[in-house]
């Protein structure tokens, strides 16, 4: 292997979330603005990003671990506003960086009359004020590329919301008057060339990011009245009628055999690829089940766009911003269509995964049941074999087979049949007290008989042992007689 190959193999590689089918539309990812409440008039602020603002504010305030080191001082912190609706985590991180460093961002530049580009914001003493941070967020949302995204802004107090409203009234009114001078702008709050698009959702949520203030019912329209943290799982949209409900209805029609086609081109739709078609995502349009190819819908939105929103042929817009639904004729953001497509795809994949897991679980249970059944059958067969063996053994015992106690002359228990013995030596009653023991060879070669005498009743037990078991078969004799004790 060459050195170049080794370098290539050892090189750390990363996968983009935007390539190879890895991209997802996150349910929720927000950039947020914090303000320190350590003092009454504190101007310290902090900008960050997170998929879970209620948890993140607790981390910053030390209630949970993994808070930012720079916010460990000047606690407590209060969340002023969040910007969310980003189509990817990467887009949110780009917005966060530009919000933190507006004097370096290429997105926050404007062209003067001399065709020179100038930064709207400079690094001065007011760069961390709440007013400046709100103005930077407003400028980012009003300029490309973020003005093409389906973003939403949520405020958690009247003060920050009022700053936004005052900036909105000033934006687009003042024009940049510049010659060849490169003098820095004095007041960047007045240097915005255009205002935020009306389609951007502006929400005042007095319940706070954690929903514990008890003031949520005083909010503007568009905020849920019940208490609790903000919805970071996007359940209301993803599980609502506009996404899940309409797809279930379309699925029923597909299973019933209906031939569903694109509303615009009348061509067939590949319903197994959820990123190639769209269903009207408006929950308020209960009767609209308009299905279109995404490409057809994009062309339709571009063709139907107002004249003032169109660009010259030399600078065409690749993607539309919003348009009218071909069926219900209501305004829908392009980003809302894409968001619904990814939500639908995720739900279908989760359902398929759960179905596969359920089938695998059933198969595993069936396999275990089959093994248990086989084991039970084997156990029953074994019991039958043991029962037959017990019956055979009982029959042998009833025919004269007995079990003899262990002999004092033999190291192993002895089983003998009268007249046919496999033992080398057996004492008929070894528990009897012995007075005298005599042995002699009787009955032929290799057979030795011994007597055991009891003085109390004069009973003599006679045993025999075989010296060579392989050459002669032992013979057993029991004699009982009353006689005088041997002297």
Curated annotation (Swiss-Prot):
The keyword Protease does not apply. Its main location: nucleus. GO terms for cellular component: Slx1-Slx4 complex. Residues 359-396, 438-455 have a biased composition (Basic and acidic residues). Its cofactor is a divalent metal cation. It is found in: Nucleus. Its EC number is 3.1.-.-. Transmembrane segments: none annotated. Pfam families: GIY-YIG, SLX1_C. GO terms for molecular function: 5'-flap endonuclease activity; crossover junction DNA endonuclease activity; zinc ion binding. Keywords: DNA damage, DNA recombination, DNA repair, Endonuclease, Hydrolase, Metal-binding, Nuclease, Nucleus, Zinc, Zinc-finger. Residues 27-109 form the GIY-YIG domain. GO terms for biological process: double-strand break repair via homologous recombination. Residues 397-407 have a biased composition (Polar residues). Gene3D superfamilies: GIY-YIG endonuclease, Zinc/RING finger domain, C3HC4 (zinc finger). Residues 465-475 have a biased composition (Acidic residues). A zinc finger (SLX1-type) spans 262-328. Residues 44-69, 359-407, 433-475 are annotated as: Disordered. Belongs to the SLX1 family. Catalytic subunit of the SLX1-SLX4 structure-specific endonuclease that resolves DNA secondary structures generated during DNA repair and recombination. Has endonuclease activity towards branched DNA substrates, introducing single-strand cuts in duplex DNA close to junctions with ss-DNA. PANTHER family: STRUCTURE-SPECIFIC ENDONUCLEASE SUBUNIT SLX1. Forms a heterodimer with SLX4. This is Structure-specific endonuclease subunit SLX1. The gene is SLX1.
């Amino acid at each position: 292997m060459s050195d170049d190959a080794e370098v290539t193999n050892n090189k750390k590689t990363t996968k983009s979330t935007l390539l190879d089918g890895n991209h997802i539309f996150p349910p929720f990812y927000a950039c947020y603005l914090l303000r320190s409440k350590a003092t009454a008039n504190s101007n310290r602020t902090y900008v960050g990003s997170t998929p879970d603002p209620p948890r993140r504010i607790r981390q910053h305030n030390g209630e949970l671990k993994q808070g930012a080191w720079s916010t460990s001082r000047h606690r407590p912190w209060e969340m002023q506003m969040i910007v969310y609706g980003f189509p990817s985590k990467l887009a949110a991180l780009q917005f966060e960086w530009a919000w933190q460093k507006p004097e370096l961002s290429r997105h926050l530049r404007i062209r003067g009359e001399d065709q020179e580009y100038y930064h709207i914001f400079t690094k001065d003493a007011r760069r961390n004020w709440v007013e400046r941070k709100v103005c930077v967020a407003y400028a980012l949302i009003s300029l490309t590329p973020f003005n093409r995204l389906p973003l939403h802004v949520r405020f958690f107090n009247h003060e920050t919301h009022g700053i936004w409203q005052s900036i909105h009234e000033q934006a687009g009114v003042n024009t940049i008057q510049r010659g060849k001078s490169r003098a820095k702008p004095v007041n960047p709050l007045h240097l915005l060339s255009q205002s935020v698009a009306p389609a951007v959702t502006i929400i005042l949520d007095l319940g706070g990011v954690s929903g514990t203030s008890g003031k949520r019912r005083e909010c503007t329209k568009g905020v849920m009245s019940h208490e609790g943290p903000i919805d970071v799982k996007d359940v209301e949209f993803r599980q609502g009628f506009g996404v899940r409900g309409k797809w279930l209805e379309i699925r029923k029609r597909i299973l019933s055999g209906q031939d569903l086609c694109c509303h615009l081109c009348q061509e067939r739709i590949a319903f197994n690829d959820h990123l190639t078609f769209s269903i009207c995502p408006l929950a308020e349009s209960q009767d609209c089940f308009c299905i279109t190819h995404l490409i057809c819908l994009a062309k339709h939105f571009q063709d139907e766009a107002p004249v003032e929103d169109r660009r010259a042929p030399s600078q065409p817009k690749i993607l539309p911003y919003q348009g009218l639904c071909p069926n219900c004729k209501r305004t829908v953001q392009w980003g809302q269509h894409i968001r619904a497509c990814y939500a639908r795809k995720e739900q279908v994949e989760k359902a398929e995964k759960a179905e596969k897991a359920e089938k695998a679980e059933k198969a595993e249970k069936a396999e275990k049941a089959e093994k248990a059944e086989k084991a039970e059958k084997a156990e029953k067969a074994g019991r039958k074999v043991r029962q037959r063996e017990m019956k055979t053994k009982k029959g042998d015992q009833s025919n004269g087979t007995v079990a003899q106690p262990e002999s004092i002359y033999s190291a192993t228990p002895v089983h003998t049949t009268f007249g046919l013995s496999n033992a080398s030596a057996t004492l008929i009653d070894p528990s009897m007290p012995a007075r005298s023991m005599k042995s002699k060879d009787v009955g032929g070669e290799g057979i030795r008989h011994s007597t055991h005498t009891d003085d109390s009743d004069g009973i003599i037990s006679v045993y025999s042992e075989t010296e060579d078991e392989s050459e002669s078969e032992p013979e057993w004799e029991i004699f009982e007689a009353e006689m005088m004790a041997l002297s």
